[in-house]
UniProtKB/Swiss-Prot annotation:
Pfam families: PDCD7. Component of the U11/U12 snRNPs that are part of the U12-type spliceosome. This is U11/U12 small nuclear ribonucleoprotein 59 kDa protein. It is found in: Nucleus. Residues 31-63 form a coiled coil. Residues 277-287 have a biased composition (Low complexity). One of its GO terms (cellular component) is spliceosomal complex. One of its GO terms (biological process) is mRNA processing. PANTHER family: PROGRAMMED CELL DEATH PROTEIN 7 (PTHR48190:SF2). It comes from the Eukaryota. Residues 274-297 are annotated as: Disordered.
Length: 382
């Protein structure tokens, strides 16, 4: 809006409008209440300026229509002029004066706020403006926080019946569980009481039997002591006839076994003597030294077998297989070679007792496991 375009050719003299005094640039001017009042006045002035702009635009439209009210469009502005019986020039003059006065008032109201954007203004003004801005933002935040708080409180109040219902349901469930537990505990207590009563009755019923059992045990102990005493004195008890007959039967069987073993040893001696004769006739002349050694060994063995004082009487009690294996190799060279060949089937080529397909184990992990190993030297068994 530029009121200079609406200036009349000869404007009349008019007094300058009354302007508010210039408030102090710092201090009380930048408090919240004063700034709020100033902003309200500024908002009212801006609203008046917008209305004045619309009025001037309407007057310009009427003036462009050659200033004739009759030729102008019949609108609210023309009707107003006809009702007031005012000329278009006079109304234009009054409107321009009001617009100029309004612009002066607007400049006066905006003048205190010029220090905020002016770079040459002192820092006190800027700091006061910044503090006021912070206060206003804080006030806005507080309003928003209070609004959120009220909304949360309303939501909590709306949810309060639901919480009460939930608490009631939980209390009912807990009460039912506790009642079920109490009933189960009462049943368990009743069962325990019944079991105690049954145990007491059973104990009362078994007490005489237990007493009789203890008496029987004591009588048996006393009887065993008397039997031992009689045995020491040389008495024979009739209830031990089976044991006596069994001991007699075992002694007879032992004598029969000893007689049979003597017969077996005699037959073995005859068999060994016949084998010696056959091996002596079939041996080569190149093995004379070996035959002599075997004959000497056989003679020494025969002497030891015939000598009763050297403790060789147990040889006659050995079975045929044992005698043929252990003592036949000392007498018969053929039997010795046969035994050696039987053992060769279980020995490896290197003379070790470990089979050839045996996997060599890994070394021990530490000294403790190594101490468990037994280092036995290899023996030549061939």
């Amino acid at each position: 809006m530029n009121p200079a375009n609406f200036q009349p050719p000869n404007p009349p003299f008019h007094w300058a409008p009354m302007l508010p005094p210039d408030p102090p640039r710092c201090g009380m001017f930048w408090n919240t209440k004063n700034i709020t009042d100033q902003l309200k006045q500024l908002q009212d002035t801006l609203n008046l300026a917008k209305s004045m702009e619309k009025e001037l635009e309407a007057l310009k439209m009427i003036k462009d229509a050659k200033g004739s009210v009759e030729n102008a469009v019949q609108d609210s502005g023309v009707e107003y002029l006809e009702a007031r019986k005012m000329d278009l020039g006079q109304q234009e003059m009054l409107s321009v004066d009001a617009a100029n006065s309004l612009m002066s008032t607007l400049r006066a109201q905006l003048e205190p706020f010029r220090f905020v954007v002016d770079e040459n203004s002192p820092w006190e003004e800027k700091s006061a403006a910044v503090r006021l801005t912070c206060k206003m933002k804080k006030s806005i935040r507080n309003k928003l926080w209070k609004k959120r708080k009220r909304r949360c409180a309303a939501e909590m109040r709306a949810k309060e019946p639901e919480r009460f219902e939930q608490a009631d349901r939980e209390a009912d469930e807990w009460r039912e569980k506790e009642m079920a537990k109490d009933m189960a505990n009462r049943k368990v207590d009743e069962m325990k009481a019944i079991e105690k009563i049954k145990a007491k009755r059973e104990r009362k019923r078994l007490e005489p039997e237990l007493e009789l059992a203890l008496i029987v045990e004591e009588m048996q102990e006393l009887r065993s002591l008397r039997i031992e005493k009689l045995k020491k004195q040389g008495h024979f008890l009739p209830e031990e006839d089976d044991k006596f007959f069994e001991s007699v039967r075992a002694a007879v069987e032992q004598e029969e076994n000893q007689a049979q073993s003597l017969i077996n040893t005699e037959t073995e001696e005859h068999v060994i003597a016949s084998e010696e004769n056959t091996t002596l006739t079939t041996s080569n002349k190149t093995n004379n030294d070996t035959d002599k050694d075997s004959n000497t060994n056989a003679a020494s063995c025969e002497r030891t077998m015939k000598a009763p004082d050297n403790g060789c009487d147990n040889i006659s009690n050995l079975p045929v297989e044992v005698y043929h294996y252990y003592y036949g190799s000392n007498i018969d060279m053929g039997r010795l070679i046969e035994i050696r060949r039987e053992w060769d089937a279980y020995l490896s080529a290197g003379g070790s007792r470990i089979p050839g397909h045996w996997v060599q184990p890994s070394p021990p992990a530490n000294e403790i496991w190594a101490s468990c190993l037994v280092n036995t030297p290899k023996r030549d068994l061939s």
